Amino acid sequence: MSRGRRPQQAASGYDCVVVGAGPVGLALAMAAAEEGSRVLLVDAGNLRSGKRDIPRDASFRTEITDPLRHADASLTTRRGVGGTSWLWGGRCVTLEPIDFEPRDYVPRSDWPIRLDDVTPWLEQAARYIDCGSAVFRSSRPDWDGLSEITMSNLERWARQPKLARGLGARVLAHPRVTAMLDSRLVDLEMADDGSIAGLVVERGGERTTLHGDAYVLAMGGLEVTRVLLDVQSRHPHLFGGVDGPLGRYYMGHATGSIADIVLTDAARAADLDFERDEHDTYIRRRFTLTPEAQRRHRVLNTSFYLDNPPFYEHTHRHPTLSAVFLGIAIAPIGRILLAEGIRLRHVGPRPYRVGAHVRNILRRPWQAAVDVIDILLRRYASPVRKPGFILHNAGGRYSLHYHAEQLPNPDSRVVRTVGDDGTPVLRVDYRYLEGDVDSLLRCHELLDAELQAAGLGRLEYRASDEDGVRALAWEQATDGFHSIGTTRMSARPDEGVADGDCRVHGVANLYIASTSLLPTSAEANPTFFAAALAVRLAHHLSAHARRTERTGRSDSAERSDAVGAAAD
């Protein structure tokens, strides 16, 4: 590894050039290096830049059409080693077989691959992301009486989500990895045969062209899309053409809470709390609908989990929640403890009812002190970071949080325009559909019906009628953290940007490793699965590199055939 190598010294001789040192790029670089490939890892940031907001770039700007629906880039992206893991909560969830299937009620839902194509690489991704294991099913039985609802789906949590110190350090120390940091990708050079001739990067005001056998764009979803849109502006026939799929089908998730869950037996809440498994990793069971129920009721994949009441609602009267609220409401303290996007969600809208929260603390100050110390020790002083906490109560009442799939929508998109001053603009027009909310409300109804029929509990909505509940769901419909779909996989080039091997359609040696590849959003947070796709891609590319080394051939046509046929 060499971090200090001058650009002209690091310009050629690599099996794989990876742009982006976030979770997905790091996983790809490590997997490829462990397979024997020579990897050049390029990132616009450095070892420390992920700790702060990305400085404004005079070469382009981003405009968000509806800020109520999409978070600002300062809350969702970072540059440098570790990338957006500096802001990541660490939740790891895999996709399910139904997520890959064509569903007639979900347009453009067919993937060019199936879960079985990625399963062999899940364990390796879990090792890199540090979530203990690729076991995502609980062996514990569901509660008696549940049939369309299951509790077997697990979410796992990275022991330490900020990956720069762990995976990042190992990647940079690997002898087969050369890192070029503080090097911004500015262009893709096209060869006469339509392949990539090289990547142009700028470092310290100096431009240089990097050469490798394969090039992988492993930045965040919007950044990968921006780069390809920029190239398409000069080569309109690429990536499906200017009216094609590039930038369309932008998805994330619907997430929030519109109801409380009231358990008949308050002790059952422990079944849905965080726990450490045999891998010394935190896991949590969740409510999800079985695949059969999803098909029968024609609903999108949706998960539910227990949560505390909103910290900012002083009416919870809980001293610990109020103490936590007051701590994170002080911005300099809260930003140390939480990523800013998460902090803002917990502190809620102004005005803050500080006096009411102080009175809550004074009811039982010793409980607040003991609980807060325990939370701080388990979350910030432990080698295995506890991702959250649930304060149990004798009434069995908890906030019910949802995380729901979105419908693929071609009008939810990002486009490249040019401002009046000539600066390229990435315009983000992120949208939800009424169908997203319809499915979400129906899933709540199905969960409520099963709980009541089995005598296990009930849901109590936070609005008095259906219109009010729907309005609450729309109020919370916002994302921008999960950039899915804008370079979607597809079997045909007119339906997507990349094929099932993550290779860009029509460009033999250009690949994508990003959450933007996913054609559907499922209910799963996308980071872990994108890392697994990257590990799979690394094995494909490394197999081709070994074959090329044996035969001495590396032309683009051979690469296109060889990688497409690499070991599945």
Whereabouts are the PLM-identified features?
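Glycine-rich loop(s) and the adjacent beta-strand/alpha-helix scaffold that form part
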Residues: 34, 47-48, 202-277, 514, ...
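A glycine-rich dinucleotide-binding beta-alpha-beta segment and adjacent secondary-structure elements
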Residues: 180-191, 378-414, 426-520
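FAD cofactor-binding and catalytic pocket of flavoenzymes
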Residues: 243-246, 255, 259-423, 480-483, ...
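Glycine-rich Rossmann-fold phosphate-binding loop(s) that bind the pyrophosphate
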Residues: 19-23, 44, 219, 515
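Conserved redox-cofactor binding core of oxidoreductases
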Residues: 104-198, 476
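Extreme N-terminal leader/targeting segments of oxidoreductases
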Residues: 1-16, 34-35, 543-553, 559-564
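Redox-cofactor-proximal catalytic regions of oxidoreductases
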Residues: 60-135, 407-417
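N-terminal Rossmann-like FAD-binding beta1-loop-alpha1 element of flavoenzymes
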Residues: 14-41
